[in-house]
Amino acid sequence: MHAIYKFTHDGKQLVQTIGTPTVKGADGTHFNRPTFMSWLPDGTMFVADGYNGTRVAKFDKNGKFLLDWGQKGNPPNETRPGYMNNVHGIAVDPVTRRVFVNDRANHRIQVFDENGKYLYEWSMGAEPSDIHLLYMGADRYIWAFDRGTSKVLKYDQEGHFLYSFGTWGDFPGGFWGVHGMSVDQDGNFYVAEVDSGRVQKFRPRPGANPAYMVSKPVYSAWH
């Protein structure tokens, strides 16, 4: 807890640790229950920190701390720009370098430049009720998962809803508490489910419309 670990692709060797394991904090060497991270093509990384940290932390590709931003506000659900309540998802545009932050408990997405300057936001409203994570691939659309409806959702960068798929279930192909999702260079889509304790892999169907498929990732220098 409170740390990020980097392993070799086969998972056998730990090659880097960012943060101080088991020690919480809010600075360049400590996190407070971080949730997700995202990368720019040059390897610059952004950490959503997180359940208790309520901030975004920026690092270079070598793990050197650069800056952070965000605060909880008073009361905890204060919704002025830059105030957050459960930073639970983050995605970065590889072209504009804008940072999209899932302000989960405030039911909104806040958008910043890469150095934390507030740009704009959009509200999720009552539905979807519980956005858990964000992902942006090479197509530069935003994909999210809503635990309330067990659906994967697609948005443009202004927050316009475009498409969704998925249904609740513990059967193959159903979603039950998705808490992580990713895509590999072949277009295979992976979801990690906290409630079922499983990882599912979906292969792209030959001839499928790319608009309905979660985009392949942007290559990162953090490898």
List PLM regions with ranges.
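Eukaryotic scaffold repeat domains enriched in small/polar residues
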Residues: 1-223
